[in-house]
């Protein structure tokens, strides 16, 4: 089944009838408009392309304007694609709302994690720090050895070292849908989801449910 594109609003909590506090992330899912339908005959695979939200007219490029005009949909803030399974059919211009999750209990949420800039090995990879005293005066947060000597004479690819952290695509799996608010186009998902407030997130039915 396809997913939906939403916007992370923030976190709050709701209470059950027993008084148990549940931390939830609020995801606003505006109607996803189908801007293109891809088929095996035309594109080699079955998928739909969707857009959501809106974009200022002066921010829409001419190719984008032509693409949206051909589909007869309002220009959105981006384009996303979902593969279709056999038997699923959608028409260009159709709108997908948060109600598609009425029968879904678990979802996977994909977003862009918060950027942390250039970070050391302790923060980036949870390395242990070295002694604060006992003769150590320079290497408290240093990573230590990064390899051998002249054989192999290089640092292996993938070695955990300091570097850019965050701002990458992250998926959190098997999150529980606590509530679907169709009136306000909101999804209340238990726990935290990747990304900063206001960021785009993709919500799909869980693959491991």
UniProtKB/Swiss-Prot annotation:
Disulfide bonds: none annotated. Methylated by PrmB. GO terms for biological process: translation. Keywords: Methylation, Ribonucleoprotein, Ribosomal protein, RNA-binding, rRNA-binding. GO terms for molecular function: rRNA binding; structural constituent of ribosome. GO terms for cellular component: cytosolic large ribosomal subunit. The modification N5-methylglutamine is found at residue 150. InterPro entries: Ribosomal_uL3, Ribosomal_uL3_bac/org-type, Ribosomal_uL3_CS, Transl_B-barrel_sf. Belongs to the universal ribosomal protein uL3 family. One of the primary rRNA binding proteins, it binds directly near the 3'-end of the 23S rRNA, where it nucleates assembly of the 50S subunit. Part of the 50S ribosomal subunit. Forms a cluster with proteins L14 and L19. This is Large ribosomal subunit protein uL3. It comes from Aliivibrio fischeri (strain MJ11).
